[in-house]
Amino acid sequence: MRIRSARSAPLPALLLAAALAAPAAAQSSANDSGPRLRLPVEEIALGARVQTLFSTSSVDSVQPADVTIRRVYLEASVKVNAFVGGKLQMDFAGDRAVVRDAYLRLNVSPGLQLLAGNAYKPFSLIALTSDTRILPIERGALIRGAAPLDEYNLLSGLQYTERDLGLQVLGSPTGAPLGFGYAVGAFRGPLGGSVGDQSPVSLAARATVEPLQALRFGAAWSSRDFRARSGDALQRGHAFELDAEYGDYGVPGLHLVGELATGDFSSADERRFTAAQAWLGYRTPRLSRALHAVEPTFRLSVGDVDAGAPANVGTLLTPGVGLYFGGLNRVSLNYDVWLPKADENDTLHSAKLMFQLAF
């Protein structure tokens, strides 16, 4: 929902729009009176998502079925003027509110933008895709009572990706060949503030091209400091990623997403990981007034570590289907099958049913 020229909207109308997501903000008139909220901005876009997740788990140590509120996000994207904007996103699903996105964006030109604050590192197409749009319910393996290391969980657990506090330079220059885009950033890193007088830093960079309509390729690099085995010494680790995507979210037809990543699992003992993940979906045209689309999906995600791999690396298989009822509002059903590398006979299973409200 977007509120334009918010300077003149009455305060009650703004509060009602934010809480209930009314189709449009009430318009003021010459006879309006009472308290007003005056905001010196051109536009505010309010959004929210609620994801209710029913899940099962084949792990004996946990209850076989459970229900949880997976995410409750409220967000506001602000355009102050053509040069200044930003975003604030909060998650209320846990015991306390958590800031997810919080940043200022300076739009110097299409080819040069500055982003300062808490935001995703420019690494991993799958991590950068909103959880309201991803084809499977979760980006990676999530099975209660287990800690499987598939592709996404490796990258996220090692903190080569995910959100971090820092400064990014990004853009897509007008007229650049193949629709070239880039992003480069320096971040506080997972060890920030915890290694005495040292200043660890995390770095990430990503470049993308679109040689054909709906066909995109990307390459990225991420680097972070690890603790050495003894003392406060730091050792640098690196990860590299290639990705490709064909198709678009919300568009009927075939949709393919894939990425391959490799890097340092632990710089202390020089172990490396290799991982890959691929999604496949096919979205139908609109089926009825209520049911906008049905999208069968399949996901393959593999994680591996050389020389003494952890017992929880392996392969994740996820068939599923999504029912869309307009916009991003959907009901999705997934069935995760986890095949650990150490013992493929110790297969884990998890069925998931998610109800998503998003606007």
What are these regions (language model features)?
Residues 2-12:
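Bacterial N-terminal signal peptides that target proteins for export
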Residues 39-43, 208-306, 357:
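Detector for outer-membrane/organellar transmembrane beta-barrel domains
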Residues 347-359:
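Outer-membrane beta-barrel "beta-signal"
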Residues 285-332, 338:
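C-terminal hydrophobic structural anchor segments
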